[in-house]
Amino acid sequence: MQAAERDGVAGGLEATAAVAATGGGEASSEPPSPPKAASFDLLDLVRSYRRLELYLEPLRDAAEGVRALLRWQRPLCSLLVCLGLNFLLLTLDQAAWYSVLALLVLLPALLGYLQETYRVRPSERELLRRKYHSVRREDLRRVQLSRQEALAQVKCFLIQLEGFLSGLCYNCEAVYRVLYWENPTVSSQFYGALLGSVCILYLLPLCWVMAILNSTLFLGNSQFYQVIKELKASVEQSLGTKPLESAPEPAKPLPTDAPPDRTPTPTSTEDLTPGSVEEAEEAEPDEEFKDAIEEDDEGSQCSADFDLSLPDNGFMSKNDVIRSKVSRLTERLRKRYPSNNFGTCTGCGATFSVLKKRRSCSNCGNSFCSRCCSFKVPKAVMGATAPEAQRETVFVCAQCNQMLIK
């Protein structure tokens, strides 16, 4: 009986193998189907990028804290950290440093374990409230966005990606310029610093090398010197050693003879337009009271031009015609020059007056005198796209001028 069963099982296996071979032959005769093309969804890429931002948020916060310490945004904290690190680097031995590293490894593990162990278990009602009123990190894949929100997310991601790639390319170009000696001064400084670092590592102990590196990071940046300058200025102001700036004495008016009554002779065919008034406003002499002289010169220049644009009607004398034209010109110039001259210059601190006119920076909007706000830049530098923006210029302060021309 068992022998018959074994024969039956063997026959069934042979039949199955024959059917499989026949089917395999038919399958091999058919051409293989082309592989399915991999689909690329830009919105999924953006979601993954946002999730990565959430996961790396603690590292970003730590980097921001380190950057704030190195930039001396809080001078007292930066000073304490710098001195504390130097003290630890110079006093701790090798065994103590291994203990500190072990503590740094165990501390996050212990904090995570305690947080999970002693975490307050929320009630069912609290869980329902969190479910309907919060979005968790694991729920980001199931969030349904509208088309406008998706496009906004994709656009923001592409802008950030473009900025990151631009900065990376700029840094790579700077490295290549140093390596290929395009700027011999910078390249010599770089290789000299490398050789000096190797010599210091060979001659000095490691603790001293780390202390020098820490001091260089904290003390060798421009923010530290800015803090020192501010501290020095505050100390001088508190002690009263800084002399007060004396106000400029007004110049004595020169005696002038009464000009004869005469009509202005037409010297050009230029009409009084806003562009001509703006060009007259931009003219700057180099005298002490250039604003007052500029106002007088522009008034006479524009009055001569205005005489051509308004013909005589025959019922008024020449003096009446001139007075009417000058009154209209004065109204136009009053719009150009504000009557409120109170305040001080942001740059030099000079008080605005009739002789010291106020001028606003076209980039930052702060109020300056004509000496501090005397730099001209094209409007195209500030983002204007009109064709005339390449030719038209506006006044900016010195700080904005340095920022815009870079």
From Swiss-Prot:
Residues 93 are lumenal. Residues 193-213 dip into the membrane without crossing it. GO terms for molecular function: zinc ion binding. Residues 250-263 have a biased composition (Pro residues). Residues 239-295 are annotated as: Disordered. Zn(2+) 2 binds at residues 361, 364, 397, 400. It comes from the Eukaryota. The keyword Endoplasmic reticulum applies. Its main location: membrane. One of its GO terms (biological process) is neuron projection development. One of its GO terms (cellular component) is axon. Residues 1-210 are annotated as: Sufficient for localization to endoplasmic reticulum tubular network. Residues 278-295 have a biased composition (Acidic residues). It is found in: Recycling endosome membrane; Endoplasmic reticulum membrane; Cell projection, Growth cone membrane. It is a multi-pass membrane protein. This is Protrudin. It comes from Gallus gallus (Chicken).
